[in-house]
Amino acid sequence: MQIENHKEEVPFAHYCERFAALDPQEAAARTGTPFENGAFRITLLGHPYRITHPEFSISGEGGTALKSLPAQTFLMRWLLEGKQTAGSRDFLTFREMPWGELYIQPFTGRVLQRAAFSFGTRLEAFRAACTAMGGLPLQAGDAGFEFTLLGNYRLRMLLWAGDDEFPPSAQLLYSAN
């Protein structure tokens, strides 16, 4: 296979090799992800997926597909390195995460500013998109939604509309677990 996208395909291939050597029973116990009949059953942002082992392949239940290599790599890394924890009522900003200060500038540009300027004057479109993704409405910001990312890990997306005085802004919060 000739690699065309080094940013996505190289990490994906690396984790596929590690995934093949994974002890599925240990991973199931550590992550709380059911493993039976040669496959993990995992839910990402409300969508159930079946991940086969030892050869990685992913299929959506109910016809949903997960074509994104970064998302597939994320799920492999979860099974390789993740740990299920108890839920938390507390939430942290990206900056408050252990690595947050190091990556805050790219995160702000790629996530927060993009969300603010894509939806800051279109709150109804933001609400429709979040509802379609399975988000639960929150009484926070001008529009806010909570999503179950994976297991007990949740995230909140908050949006404040822009006006004549202030530009739109957004915040993404992660459950503190």
Which functions belong to the PLM regions below?
Residues 120-177:
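Conserved binding-pocket/active-site segment within a compact domain
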Residues 61, 65, 116, 143, ...:
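Short, charged/polar micro-motifs that form catalytic or ligand-binding hotspots
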Residues 47-73, 160-177:
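Intrinsically disordered, low-complexity regulatory segments enriched in Ser/Thr/Pro
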Residues 27-53, 136-161:
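Amphipathic, interaction-prone secondary-structure segments
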Residues 1-38, 71, 78-133:
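Short Lys/Arg-enriched alpha/beta "domain-start" segment
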